[in-house]
Amino acid sequence: MGNENSSLVKIRRGSKEPNVIIECVDSKKDHLSTPVYRKKSRRSVSQSRPTSIIEPPKRSIVPPIPALIKGQLSGDDSISIGSRKSSVSNFRLSSDGSGDSLLSPLTASSNDRRRSRSLCSAQMKDDAQAVAAQQNKDDKTGGSGGRKASSGLVPSLNRLRIQQCFKAAKPSIGDAIMKRAAASRAEMRTMLSKMNEKQIECLGKQMFELITDAVENADKSEKVLTHARQLGGTYASLCPLGFRPDLFAPLADAAIAECVKLDGVHKRCETLSAWSQLFSALFTGVRDGYYQRVRHQRRTSLPQNTITKQLSVDFSKTSDTSFVR
């Protein structure tokens, strides 16, 4: 094959299959077609096992050009494809998929779109701003009083949540608290059954006034706790009807449940935490006032003459025994 003077000049190839036989014949003995030798061709690279997958080059897709732009570009044949891409990129697509906004230029408002926010997040932002304004107001009025001068029953953020919730409250919430407490404890039902409607209404009104005072003066803890102690002292007079100090717990739970129902803006867990902190402080004062009144009643239950007589008798006994010795 490498010799040019060789007589094997005619090569016949049948196909490109790997098993095809290449026949070389003599040119002088073409009519006999006797093959001198046969040789199998090598496998092509494409038919061997692929070692790696060669991906075709990616073509960049050019976006369609509006008819108006095509008419403008057809007059100038020297414009390149890159300039067409830049001209197309200067137009924006509308969000609804219509083609009318392709011809409208870009504006600052299109890039400055605000995402829709939930009512809860917007309310939290308003609460944070209100807290900042309240803190600035406290700093101006309180001066250098420190943290204790501006401290209240609950933190500032919870105080604002409570005040916003209680705007929807009605005076009938006191009666609802009493009914809920009676439904949860049999002892409470027994005590209320021994009272007339006017007395029960008076208890509900006192509870509503206490909550209203606590909400309005949440930053004045001493004033609110004084009111709570006075209310707790009135419950000491209900002991003959079967009232016990452990019934303050169902009263507090009923008050929290009724006040949480008033809110529909904040998260339920946040509202529950805020009201729980407030009523925990309130009923601490109510319980303290109850025990103060009970102790006072026990001290004053015996007549003064009986107390002095007992003291004199005890003193005489001790003096006689000491004299005998």
Swiss-Prot record:
Disulfide bonds: none annotated. InterPro entries: Globin, Globin-like_sf, Globin/Proto, Mb-like_M. Residues 153-291 form the Globin domain. GO terms for molecular function: heme binding; oxygen binding. Residues 32-65, 99-152 are annotated as: Disordered. It comes from the Eukaryota. CDD domains: Mb-like (cd01040). This is Uncharacterized protein B0361.4. It comes from Caenorhabditis elegans. The lineage of its organism: Eukaryota, Metazoa, Ecdysozoa, Nematoda, Chromadorea.
